[in-house]
């Protein structure tokens, strides 16, 4: 599956547009992680626990988007975008979306 955040993929021609595809996941924060990350936040620096959480969530959302594209018979997704939003006080949603296409 070829992915691109632009309207095209170099060296490929879009021969059919199959429609919007998306994948999402909602992740809740971990109380234990919140405590350690809160202490680290006082000292400054990267909050690696949250970085890992968001990276894993983005990967899962992207994988789900790809599964939806494959179900349509696509071999590419163009205009790929990611969004995040807060869910309640302790959760975050990651949404990956794009346009499923057939390429030549």
Swiss-Prot record:
Record Pfam families: YbjQ_1 (PF01906)
Transmembrane segments: none
PANTHER family reported for this sequence: UPF0145 PROTEIN SCO3412, UPF0145 PROTEIN YBJQ
Family (UniProt): Belongs to the UPF0145 family.
Protein's name according to its UniProt entry: UPF0145 protein Hlac_1015
Protein species of origin: Halorubrum lacusprofundi (strain ATCC 49239 / DSM 5036 / JCM 8891 / ACAM 34)
């Amino acid at each position: 599956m070829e992915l691109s955040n632009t309207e095209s993929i170099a060296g490929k021609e879009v021969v059919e547009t199959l429609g919007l595809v998306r994948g999402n996941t909602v992740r809740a924060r971990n109380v234990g992680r919140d405590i350690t990350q809160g202490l680290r936040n006082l000292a400054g620096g990267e909050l690696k626990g949250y970085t890992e959480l968001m990276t894993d969530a983005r990967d899962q959302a992207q994988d789900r988007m790809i599964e939806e594209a494959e179900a349509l018979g696509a071999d590419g997704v163009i205009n790929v975008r990611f969004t995040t939003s807060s869910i309640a006080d302790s959760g975050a949603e990651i949404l990956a979306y794009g346009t499923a296409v057939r390429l030549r």
